[in-house]
């Protein structure tokens, strides 16, 4: 990788799930040479079909998109973007580091490090010291990006030059990336909104209505902001695309896996039964545990997160959880 302001001409996307594939399609349409990396059997299927029939059926790959199972070849691109679940993020970075040091790295993974319960940038900085780091986050459903529907995201990096370079690469006819220097806040917004989406799904699944959903979104935003500020993020970040934008989308639309997890839990399904129905990774299940422990460590009050954690990991009845939220002591907003 180089740190110049020259345009990106090639990019390696690590992770061939729905979001990684959608970003690969977007960037290839923008004219970049794209290599999409995943498991060998997965890549063989994508190469043969020239589409991701499992996650994005009916959306053909552009000519410039090449599925590739050879990591050493993929990381030779101008840029590398990691789009794997947060649970696999550390291991994938170690695999890259074993091949070559990077001067820059970006990711579109939404989650916290499962070992440290901190934003992924801290892990990335330890593995690639001195590298420019960036995260891409915002209100995005993979299928809509792949279909070319209008979308806006945030590209956050401590290097303004790097975030601008990525934003330019991502810019398309229907896709826009705004830049930010608040890499911590943008990551937290993308990770913790998944917990709130589970709560919104539970509330809607129990029939509590639109008023309750609006309250959950608003108070959920307050929780995310408190946690972010405690970790050094800017409060205004959470009013942007990676905060309020992503939170609103994920809490209100059934394309959201996390919202669907909440709906399934409200039906009485177990976590494993809900996962089997959704058939994709549900980041909010992990984020609930990591966020709850982090809030306890930092002394940040996060009542919605606490109730979601108790439902997922302590077997609390969702009806009881909602009652406990409503019966908390009176306080000023």
Regions found by a protein language model. Name each.
Residues 1-59, 68-69:
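NAD(P)+-binding Rossmann beta1-loop-alpha1 motif at the extreme N-terminus of oxidoreductases
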Residues 11, 33-34, 131-133, 177:
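Hydrophobic anchor at the start of a short beta-strand
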Residues 61, 67-150, 166-168:
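Rossmann-like NAD(P)(H) cofactor-binding subdomain of soluble oxidoreductases
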Residues 107, 132-137, 177-181, 239-240, ...:
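General beta-strand structural signal in soluble alpha/beta enzymes
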Residues 123, 127-131, 150-237:
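Internal alpha-helical scaffold of NAD(P)-dependent oxidoreductase catalytic cores
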Residues 193, 200-204, 229-239, 243, ...:
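NAD(P)-dependent Rossmann-like dehydrogenase/reductase catalytic/cofactor-binding core
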């Amino acid at each position: 990788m180089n740190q110049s302001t020259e345009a990106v001409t090639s990019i390696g996307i690590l992770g061939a799930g729905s979001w990684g594939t959608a970003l690969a399609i977007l960037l290839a349409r923008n004219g970049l040479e794209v290599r999409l990396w995943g498991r060998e059997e997965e890549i063989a299927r994508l190469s043969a079909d020239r589409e991701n029939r499992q996650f994005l059926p009916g959306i053909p790959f552009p000519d410039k998109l090449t599925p590739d199972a050879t990591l050493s070849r993929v990381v030779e691109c101008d840029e590398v973007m990691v789009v794997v679940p947060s649970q696999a993020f550390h291991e994938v970075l170690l695999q890259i580091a074993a091949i070559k040091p990077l001067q820059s790295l970006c990711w579109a993974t939404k989650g916290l490090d499962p070992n440290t319960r901190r934003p992924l940038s801290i892990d990335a900085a330890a593995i690639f010291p001195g590298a420019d780091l960036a995260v891409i986050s915002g209100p995005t459903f993979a299928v809509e990006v792949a279909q070319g529907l209008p979308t806006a995201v945030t590209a956050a990096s401590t290097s303004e030059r790097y975030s601008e370079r990525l934003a330019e690469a991502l810019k398309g006819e229907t896709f826009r990336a705004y830049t930010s220097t608040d890499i911590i806040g943008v990551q937290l917004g993308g990770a913790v909104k998944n917990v709130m989406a589970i709560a919104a799904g539970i509330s809607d699944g129990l029939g509590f209505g639109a008023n309750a959903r609006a309250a959950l979104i608003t108070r959920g935003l307050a929780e995310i902001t408190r946690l972010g500020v405690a970790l050094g993020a800017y409060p205004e970040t959470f009013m942007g695309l990676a905060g309020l934008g992503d939170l609103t989308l994920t809490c209100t639309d059934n394309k959201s896996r996390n919202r669907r997890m909440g709906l399934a839990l409200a039906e009485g399904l177990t976590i494993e039964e809900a996962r089997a129905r959704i058939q994709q990774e549900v980041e909010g299940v992990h984020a609930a545990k990591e966020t709850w422990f982090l809030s306890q460590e930092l002394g940040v009050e996060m009542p919605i997160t606490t109730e979601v954690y108790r439902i997922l990991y302590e077997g609390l009845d969702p009806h009881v959880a909602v009652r406990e939220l409503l019966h908390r002591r009176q306080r000023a907003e």
